[in-house]
Amino acid sequence: MVDIHNHILVDVDDGPKSINEAIELLKQAQSENVTDIVATPHHLHKRYSNDIEKVKIKLNELKNNSEIKKLGLNLYVGQEIRITDQIIEGIKNKEIEGINESRYLLIEFPSNEIPYYTNQLFYELQTMGYIPIIAHPERNKAIVQNLDLLFELINGGALSQITASSLLGDFGNNIRKLSLKMIDSNLAHFIASDAHSITNRPFMLKQLFNDRKLKAYYEELESYLKNGKLVLTNERISKQIPTQDYKQKKWFGLL
């Protein structure tokens, strides 16, 4: 399985603080049948800055570790880029790259809002040949209150990534239900762990397929994982037309 969003690099953000913590986290990833991992430390965040060269250096430290080599995992370079008006400048200055040098950029919103310039920025990124992947939109308060905001962005060409623990109910039943609405309305394209540590949001991809409440969604979840592989090889993601089915369906009492 491919995981396109996690925090495995040592002492660069709110992920592992030591090489031993990183090793334990990667062992846990292996136990979840994860084979390919994109390291996506926070960048342009108010507390963290990780330009792509720094990410490459820190990732090579993991790749060259003898214990990690034994795990046989494939590790790739990425960034979780906080949305700001500095993204295009960062691309031009070669501080930002797509996942594994692809056209795909993982972009995070603030937790409470979608900035007013988001549509224009996403349009400009797409004219430059990049495709924004919105990280965990189901946890954004503005989207929770109004799913039309996400529909507009997806309809405009963006993609989105749901966090596995959202579907498993770790952020509460409302977030779980919203995540399922996104799937039913073709507003999701990837599933990822957003792993930080073995105790705080570990890798949980295999657990999705052990949750019988998600059985009706196994096919979609498998396709989202396959999409992760397409990102690594910079191939086009085939997506279904987004709908507003979430406006008609009654979700009372679901799950």
UniProtKB/Swiss-Prot annotation:
Highest taxon in the source lineage: Bacteria
Residue pairs linked by disulfide bridges in the UniProt entry: none
A Gene Ontology biological process term: capsule polysaccharide biosynthetic process
Gene3D superfamilies in UniProt: Metal-dependent hydrolases
Key words of the record: Capsule biogenesis/degradation, Exopolysaccharide synthesis, Hydrolase, Protein phosphatase
Pathway(s) the chain acts in: Capsule biogenesis; capsule polysaccharide biosynthesis
GO molecular function: manganese ion binding; protein tyrosine phosphatase activity
EC number: 3.1.3.48
Cited InterPro entries: Caps_polysacc_synth_CpsB/CapC, Pol/histidinol_Pase-like
Catalysed reaction equations from the record: O-phospho-L-tyrosyl-[protein] + H2O = L-tyrosyl-[protein] + phosphate
Function text: Required for the biosynthesis of type 1 capsular polysaccharide.
Family in the record: Belongs to the metallo-dependent hydrolases superfamily. CpsB/CapC family.
Protein name as catalogued: Putative tyrosine-protein phosphatase CapC
Organism: Staphylococcus aureus
